[in-house]
């Protein structure tokens, strides 16, 4: 099992476009032995301390294998809507790991 944590930074005014992309991307996770464990849109007061920009959303996803994650990234339906992600996401940071 691999775990992916993603910090997502949105371009100002593109929140609705990002939500539209997520409407297609998130349901496809299960097709590739994945599970969305957590999707957080933290408010301003949720941050106790930070030395990086505050993300718009934080996702934690689990996949059975690294190959499942790679296959998900190449999903034809997801790729069809990738332009929405490119239009709305300023940057994202991915952390990969395993359960200890």
What feature does the model see in each segment?
Residues 35-37, 82-97:
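Conserved short beta-strand edge segments in small beta-sheet-based binding/regulatory domains
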Residues 26, 77-83:
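A common structural junction motif
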Residues 1-74, 96-100:
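Short S/T/G/P-rich N-terminal loop/turn motif that feeds into the first structured element of a domain
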């Amino acid at each position: 099992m691999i775990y992916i944590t993603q910090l997502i930074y949105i371009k100002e005014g593109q929140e609705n476009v990002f939500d539209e992309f997520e409407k297609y991307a998130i349901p496809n996770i299960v097709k590739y032995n994945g599970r969305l464990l957590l999707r957080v849109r933290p408010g301003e007061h949720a941050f106790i301390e930070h030395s990086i920009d505050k993300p718009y959303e934080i996702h934690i996803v689990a996949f059975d294998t690294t190959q499942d994650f790679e296959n998900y990234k190449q999903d034809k339906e997801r790729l069809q809507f990738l332009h929405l992600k490119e239009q709305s996401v300023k940057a994202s940071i991915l952390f990969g790991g395993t359960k200890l």
